[in-house]
Each structure stands twice: as C-alpha cells, then as structure tokens.
C-alpha cells in the first residue's frame, strides 16, 4: 500500500477519453449515452416489431437513431441498456433487448383481464459491443404504451 500512486490529469486513447480530478472524480465528457421515449402516450407499439422511440431526452453523441429505433456503438466497450415498457391494457407484453437482431434479454408480463389492467416490465443487459454493433427494443407479443410510460436508455460503462 505504501507504493500506491493516485493518478490525476487527463487520459486519451482511441476508445476512451477521461479526466480524473484530485478528489478522484472521473469525468468522461464524450461518453455515449441516451434516453428516449415515444411522443404519444395514447399510442401503442405494435407486436412483433421494433419500438421506434421518437422523443429524445438525451442522446450524447447522436448514436441513437429515432427513425429505426437503434443505438449504434461508436466505439467498442461494455454498455448498459435498460428498457421499461407498460403493457397495452389487458394484453400480455413480451419485449426484448436485441443485439444485431438477436435476443440477449427479455421480459414477459401477463396482464389482468379487462380494460385498465396494465403491468410494467423492465429488461436490462450489460453487453460487450464492437464498434458498429446495434441494439434495439423488440416488442414480441401483445403491445406497449408509448409516452413516458415506456422508455429505452443506455450508456457506455467503459
């Protein structure tokens, strides 16, 4: 322990750029991150389709594409993705996080019978991505409400 040196200053490489303060706080100003949701809370995402979240809350680096619902990794690294979806009334909901079109995580919710029986579910995944890999949310069955009831986020861990 006597030979431990505290690094302060800046570090850059092709895959990361960060600064460490004398207090030990790490700042990554260009770290890819996004949070998106749908613009219409009364609309629903259909079954067997990718969710195309069209309202951007945060899109650092502009790597989330609202036209196709995909986040494309600008650099290789470990990323965290989280999706929260609200079921469409009395329908069940199955939604997946997909990497390059293949399921890597998923959640299924059975709603109650009758109108107004909504359930929410959350799916998350920590993924090792190569530059150019894409991640999107696929609604497998049932349907999901949009608006602030359903969202998708992700960011580079390192």
Identify what each model region corresponds to:
Residues 2-158:
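Extracellular jelly-roll beta-sandwich "head" domains, especially the C-terminal globular C1q domain
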